[in-house]
Regions:
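Short, amphipathic C-terminal "tail helix"
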Residues: 430-443
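Acidic catalytic cores of enzymes that act on phosphate-bearing nucleotides/polynucleotides
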Residues: 188-267, 278
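Generic low-complexity, intrinsically disordered sequence content enriched
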Residues: 6, 14-16, 182, 195, ...
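Bacterial N-terminal signal peptides
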Residues: 1-9
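Conserved ATP-binding subdomain of kinase catalytic cores across diverse folds
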Residues: 14-34, 47, 51-82, 87-184, ...
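ATP-dependent kinase catalytic cores of phosphoinositide-metabolizing enzymes
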Residues: 17-45, 61, 216, 220-241, ...
Length: 444
């Protein structure tokens, strides 16, 4: 039986209309006349409560301002957080060293920031509970307690360990299967999926006959992106050492094709700009074209909601720095640049990495396994901050009770917000615009 600790009073923190808060947060950073931008963001959020959770973190941090004031005033507990650690942001990634190396941990640092570690744990339990709801896994009161305790205990174990997430999860069958699957692929597989016979990006990609991505040609921006790549290499000596040349004219000549990417399954960053850039054999010792991936970054959700001050770094720099800081081993490609006043994270498109799929959680046993993975990844990463001596004394039954109560409260708020969002006429109209835009690209 869990001891009941002190639980702060929970405050009604609903925004006037969820749509308005999301529009204020995202539309300033999106191209107003692009129906594959903000309308696609809205379409994604309206899909189901789980995608709404993944892509509406402004509503979560707005709620936290009123309902987690004790944590937000606990300044020693502030550490580098991922900020949006749902299951789709945990997975394998291309790691430093040999081309094709894989490691396991946090990915996609769009919402990273210095926050109380307790908020990361709260997001973990919310994610797991929503995963159960989405997959129609009914939990008894006893199972609710077992789930939160599994998350808490594995987090504590990982914080107290001296090993990274890849090592700690080396025997986990889910993870070994994920890594094994990724290692089967060749880089040529990726090029074949995206590049046509003319050496240019295809206009769309498909998975099992369904439209997966829309790729809009952007070759006219080659000069801008050559300068951006040169800037990214200047920002990352590790990345620059991989390139045959870092000269601007050589980089410009190596650009073969550029496409603006829209991935239909995206949630959190849906509507922001992403670009693929095909470079002709730019790397030392790698006799292959490479696809660079530039992803627009904006202030994190906690910054947008004034939970924490604006970072002095650009959003792309914050994202790249925090990825280096919070992953062990470090990623193979990781830098940042500015393009036309917008901030971008610079990575590369490869076939090896993959994320956890919530659809693989089919019963309580696999839900517990997901909790163990989440707790291990978060705990090992937070330990890398060197703050385990601060974190461990905080991990009391009282904190666990708080996290359980606040999870219940936020889930009630989220479902209320989601219902209001779906019922908003503006959402309906924007979904129609997004559907028309997608349809116009189908079959291209």
């Amino acid at each position: 039986m869990l001891a009941v600790g002190i639980v702060t009073n929970l405050v009604l923190a609903a925004v006037a209309a969820p749509f308005d808060e999301i529009e204020r947060a995202y539309s300033p950073y999106m191209q107003a006349d692009d129906t594959l931008a903000f309308p696609m963001k809205i379409k994604s959020l309206a899909s189901d409560p789980y995608k709404f959770w993944r892509g509406s973190k402004d509503l979560f941090y707005h709620w936290c301002k009123s309902n987690t004031t004790d944590w937000l005033s606990d300044k020693p507990a502030f550490i580098a957080n991922h900020g949006d650690l749902h299951l789709g942001n945990i997975g394998s990634y291309a790691a430093e060293g040999k081309f094709g190396n894989l490691a396991f941990g946090m990915v996609d640092f769009d919402d990273s920031g210095r926050l109380p570690f307790q908020l990361e744990l709260l997001q973990g339990l919310i994610t797991l509970r929503l995963t159960a709801e989405q997959n129609k896994i009914e939990l008894s009161a006893k199972q609710h307690g077992e789930l939160s305790k599994a998350l808490f205990d594995t987090y504590r174990t990982a914080v107290n360990s001296r090993r990274n997430a890849t090592d700690l999860l080396g025997e986990n069958q889910w993870i070994t299967k994920l890594l094994k699957k990724g290692r089967k692929h060749e880089y040529a597989d990726e090029l074949q999926e995206y590049i046509g016979a003319d050496g240019k990006f295809l206009r769309a990609t498909y998975s099992k006959g369904k439209l997966k991505e829309i790729l809009r040609p952007a070759d006219e921006r080659a000069d801008d992106f050559a300068a951006a790549i040169a800037q990214a290499l200047e920002h990352s000596p590790e990345m620059a050492r991989l390139f045959r040349s870092t000269r601007l004219d050589d980089l410009r000549r190596s650009i073969q094709s550029i496409a603006q990417r829209t991935r239909l399954g995206s949630s959190g960053s849906q509507g922001l700009k992403k670009y693929f850039i095909l470079l002709d054999k730019p790397l030392n010792d790698i006799d292959s074209p490479i696809i660079l991936y530039l992803k627009q970054e904006i202030p994190c959700a906690a910054e947008r909601q004034n939970v924490i001050p604006r970072d002095a770094r650009s959003s792309g720099e914050r994202c790249a720095d925090d990825m280096n800081h919070l992953t062990e081993p470090r990623p193979y490609f990781n830098s940042w640049c500015e393009v036309a006043g917008e901030s971008y994270w610079v990575h590369f498109k490869e076939p090896w990495s993959d994320e956890l799929d919530p659809a693989d959680v089919t019963d309580f046993a696999t839900l517990l396994q997901a909790a163990n993975i989440w707790g291990t990844v978060a705990g090992a990463t937070h330990r890398e901050e060197g703050r385990f001596e601060m974190i461990l004394p905080h991990l009391t039954l009282a904190l666990l009770s708080q996290i359980q109560a606040r999870t219940d409260a936020y889930l009630a708020q989220l479902h209320e917000d989601f219902a209001a969002f779906q019922a908003d006429e503006r959402v309906t109209k924007l979904i129609q615009q997004a559907d028309a835009a997608v349809q116009s690209h189908a079959g291209t």
